[in-house]
Amino acid sequence: VYKLAAPCRLTDTSWIQPGKSAWEWWHKAVLEGVDFPSGNKQLSLQLYKYYVDWASKNHIEYMTLDAGWSKDYIKELCSYAKEKNVKIIVWTWASCAKENPSDWIAKMHSYGVSGAKIDFFERNDQIAMRWGKEFAERLAEKKMVAVFHGCPVPTGLHRTYPNILNYEAVRGAECNFW
């Protein structure tokens, strides 16, 4: 399918850097031995700085902030992460971004966010495929990466827009939580 997709539409891809990501959601942001509240109900700038420090120390390129991050501290966190050579990817519902993706992406870019993890497409039709293309194209305009989660199956769009780092379109290990 990859070779059947349209060739890359981006003139400059030098900014696209795949890599590992720290991610608080997998273990519900529970940290032991810290002197601040942790857990999914206690997400804070302090907690995310801890993760950024850990990612930096372990040469992990990204920190993915899943559901619950706040615009109240995202700009400060992105500045902090940049000093530590860690890039921030933020999670969002597809419905939050699809109404006007350019505005949402511009806002995230202004905060210093490096990418978006877009979730809950909740369909596998041409409309969802169009959303994916639109997200990838608009993110690329701001030199931001995309991670598609709960999305349609990959169809080669990452050839056209190589800023798509990952498709999480399978029923994977996270289903063990339910």
Feature-to-residue mapping (PLM):
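Conserved structural scaffold segments of CAZyme catalytic domains across common CAZy folds
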Residues: 1-83
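Aromatic- and carboxylate-enriched substrate-binding clefts and catalytic-loop regions
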Residues: 67-178
